[in-house]
Structures are given as structure tokens and as C-alpha cells.
Amino acid sequence: MSAVGIIAEFNPLHSGHEFLLNQARLIAKKDPIVVLMSGNYVQRGEMAIMSKWDRAKAALQSGADLVFETPFSTAVEPADLFSLGNIDQLAKLGVTDLVFGVEDANLNFAYLGSRIAEIPQNHMDFKDYSQTYSTQYNQMVAHEVGHEINQPNAILGLAYAVANHNLGSPLKLHPVNRIGAGHDDILQRSGVVQSASAIRNLLLHGEDTSNLKYWMPKNEANILAKQKVYPNWNLLYPFLKYRIESSSIEDLRRIYQMSEGLEYKMKQEIHLARDFTEFLRRIKSKRYTYARLRRLSLYTLLNVTYDDMLDSFNHESLMLLGFSKKGRQYLKQNRKNIQTEIISKVDKRSAKSGSLALQVRTDRLFEQVMGVDQNFGQRPIEV
């Protein structure tokens, strides 16, 4: 039995994601749909708007057959490492095809991925410090492939393609034209497909939630409407401020991705910034994107060191969040062929090492904010 994979955050899951799952079903036919979903922290360096369990349940109710949690050491990384870790894990799960949404599905992602994969070997050292690495990299991509690719889903799709090429192309790529709004924070006046960013923005600003049921599964909409806390950086900023102010320079230097004196800059500016947005502006330079600095701030808040990430990455396992009857059958039939450890229950032993140890530790802050246990005592959702 083969399987079709989706890499997702579902933060939150909305009508556009339901469309993608439906397209995946057309490709999978009778085979299962396997989702690798980021947990309680997402790639842009933030807490997810709702728990991984609620988002996994929404995915299962929308057509997924298996939902696994992407380890923190892959989920909170730049696009290249995010893609590499996710595709590697999908391949180890026996997934044969990858479905992903893009702005233009006519692009030959497999071909472009093979072309772009050669760029880092030829251009390892980007010297223009007046621009971010990502800006220079995107310019090099445009030069190599003959046209600019600057739409967010296309950029991520290319990262998938490059990672897939570098891993020996274990997955067949199926780009699907995405529907609905772009990635901006503004709700569209017409149409039922809103962006996840716009939905999060509505929730964080305390606006009317009565229309949520038109933009996402009703059960998920009800959970979000009743949720008392919506995690965001303004809520977390006092904790970050305490962490930076109470840490020594040596402690900060051990934080993952802390480089080029940023520990001094963070120490200096945290006293002056009134909120997280101002703090980011104060430490921002042309060498670093806001996404990179948000991730660094998250690593700092959670005290995630280089050693933590290395240990997690070298001992990755996958937490099973939920399954359907078809998903259970797939795991049973392919047990001997699956090349990664699957964990369905967190206990004291499994929580002490590898990716699960980092997951349990980082989830403690989410538990404090949301007031709901995320690991101990939880069992995979069955639909």
C-alpha cells in the first residue's frame, strides 16, 4: 500500500486546506493521506493559534488518514531545513507522493528543484551584507531559472523540490493551484476562503467570530470561538524579556542560531523595546529577515541550544496525533517497512531523550499559556 503526503501547519485549518485535502484524495484514490503537521510552534517562529490536538482532529475530519507531529527541530527552521526534514520523514513513512498548494501549478517543480539544488554548491558565500541571505539567494534563483519566483507558496514548493532532489527524489511531486486569499492579514469581503493569517489576525484583535463557520470546519470554528486565549508574541514578550535580562551573554551565546553578536544586541535593546514588534525592529538589520529573528527569539524564550537541536535531529521520532481506520490499516500493513520510530504515548522514559524530550520541554510553555496538557495523558485521536 502506497500513500500520499501533505506537509502542513493548519494554523488554523481553513477552506483552502480542505480543498488541498480533497485534491490529495483524488490523487490518492483508495490509498491513505498522511499529514506531517507542525506541533504547537510553527515555522515563522510563533506559537500556533490552537493546540496540535485540535488541529489534528480538524485534519482527520477533513479527510486525512494519519496525522503525525513534525518534530520541533524540523518545524521551527528556515524553509530549506523545514523541507528537508519533512520530506525525509515522509519517505521513511513509506509515502510515495507529495501534494502541495502553489500559486502556479504549471511550474515544473521537479526540474526547477534539480536546477536550484546546484546553486549552494556554486555560491556558498554571499558577500553583500546590505541584503539578507534570502534576498541574495532568491536573486540567484531568478538568475539560474530565468524568472523571478517570489510568491510564498511557490518559494516553499521549490524548497520541497530541492530537498526532494537532494534526498534522491523519493517522492513524486504534485503541485496544486491554491484557492482563496493570499497570505496577507486582511479578510476578504467576498468568498469563503480566507487566509490563515487573516483568521489569526481576526482572533488576536478580538473581532466577531460568527463567520468562522463559513471559513473552516464547523467543529474547529466552535473550538476557536470558545477558546479563551489566542497565543501571540505580545502575550509572550514579558517572558522573553525576563529570559534575556536574566541570562548571561555566555548563556545567550549557546542559543541555537545565535550568531555575530546578536546576543549583545538583544541584551541592549530588550530594555528599550515596549513590545515584541518594537524589539524586532530594534534588532533588525539587512542581514536578517524578520522570520529569522522571530525564530531566534523563540529559541531564546524556550532556551533551545545548539546541542538540543542536534540531539533532537539525530534522534528524531514521530508523535502520532491521530488516525482513521484506513490509517490504522496502513500502519499495520507497513510496520516492517517504516523506517522511523512512531510514538503514540508519551511516558517518562520516552520524554527524556531525542526529539520527544525537546517537544515535551518546549510544550510546557504552551501548556502554561493554554492550560491544557499536550503530551502526558494524551492518546492519538481516532475517527
UniProtKB/Swiss-Prot annotation:
GO terms for cellular component: cytoplasm. It comes from the Bacteria. It is found in: Cytoplasm. Keywords: ATP-binding, Cytoplasm, Ligase, Nucleotide-binding, RNA-binding, tRNA processing, tRNA-binding. Its EC number is 6.3.4.-. It catalyses: cytidine(34) in elongator tRNA(Met) + acetate + ATP = N(4)-acetylcytidine(34) in elongator tRNA(Met) + AMP + diphosphate. This is tRNA(Met) cytidine acetate ligase. It comes from Lactobacillus acidophilus (strain ATCC 700396 / NCK56 / N2 / NCFM). The lineage of its organism: Bacteria, Bacillati, Bacillota, Bacilli, Lactobacillales. The gene is tmcAL.
